[in-house]
């Protein structure tokens, strides 16, 4: 689904909040076209102490296209394109868009 910049920013903010409250199941399309389900978080309680620094660094401008997530199964940071997001905890992107009124 092709999203506008305004929609991406709104979805990114919802995702940042949701992913900061525990572990979520994130389903997205990878750049090679395969579908991936990831158990991801931005909640410091679910990642090693040395990994949390990356989350709080603000030296780079925040992307409207990608969102960084800590993959709890791999124990590493991963990112996905907001345009390629399919669902979070079973809630599809289309429903998120209705929720934000965009």
UniProtKB/Swiss-Prot annotation:
Name recorded for this polypeptide: Uncharacterized 11.5 kDa protein in Gp31-cd intergenic region
Domain of life, per lineage: Viruses
Gene behind this protein: y13B
Species classification: Viruses, Duplodnaviria, Heunggongvirae, Uroviricota, Caudoviricetes
Source organism per UniProt: Enterobacteria phage T4
Pfam family, one: WYL_2
InterPro entries: WYL_prot (IPR024401)
């Amino acid at each position: 689904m092709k999203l506008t910049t305004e929609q991406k920013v709104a979805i990114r903010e919802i995702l940042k909040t949701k992913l900061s409250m525990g572990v979520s199941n994130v389903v997205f399309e990878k750049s090679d076209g395969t579908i991936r389900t990831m158990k991801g978080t931005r909640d410091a309680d679910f990642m090693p102490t040395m990994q949390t620094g990356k989350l709080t660094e603000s030296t780079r401008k925040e992307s409207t296209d990608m969102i960084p997530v800590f993959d709890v199964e791999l124990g590493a940071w991963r990112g996905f394109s907001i345009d390629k997001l399919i669902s979070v905890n079973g809630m599809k992107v289309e429903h998120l868009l209705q929720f934000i009124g965009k």
